Amino acid sequence: MGRKAIGMGVALVGLLALAWLRATPAMAQVTFGSPSDPARVALGVGAFDITPSRHHKDAETAGEFRGEYRFPDTFSVVAPFLGASVTTDGAAYGYFGLGVDINFGPSWVLTPNAAAGVFERGSGTRLGSWWEFRTGAELAYRFADLSRLGVAVHHTSNAGLTKTNPGEQSVLLIYSIPMH
């Protein structure tokens, strides 16, 4: 699947989401932060480097497993988190970051987030540095018990710290469990 196809898919999902929100005005109330939500443990499974570069011989898609501890809103509407991920190629990434919940009604939550941390590539994609940055978002459905099920899309790169900076994209299914 090429970058153009992925971009078109993301645009289509965005258009469908906007059409759905427009069709359901009661759900279109947007609020920032989730102050009543407790801390959560999030577990994810998906794919690492879904668009491997043809210019790097070691770049290939791998399975990814992720675990995060997400603190409740701490700085107004901003919630910190700590996490780690591993891939089937032996890569490991330990990171810390910040996210902001954007609530579309009581159930749908979009969480843009950014993180930074230490990366060990294993035998997989060479990202060019031991220090990597991750940006992305998660769209999740919040259940009555405050657990969430969603999809996360992230881009990880060294932001130009080194000459080699191919970056990678990940897509994961995430389930988060409230700690109450």
Language-model region placement:
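Solvent-exposed loop/turn segments connecting transmembrane beta-strands
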Residues: I50-G63, A84-Y95, P106, G122-W130, ...
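Outer-membrane beta-barrel initiation region
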Residues: A28-F71
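Outer-membrane beta-barrel "beta-signal"
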Residues: G63, P166-H180
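Membrane-embedded beta-strands of outer-membrane beta-barrel proteins
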Residues: F65-Y69, F96-L98, A137, L173-Y175
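Repeated loop/turn-to-beta-strand initiation elements of outer-membrane beta-barrel proteins
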Residues: V41, D73-V78, P106-L110, D145-V151
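Cleavable N-terminal export/targeting peptides
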Residues: M1-S36, H180
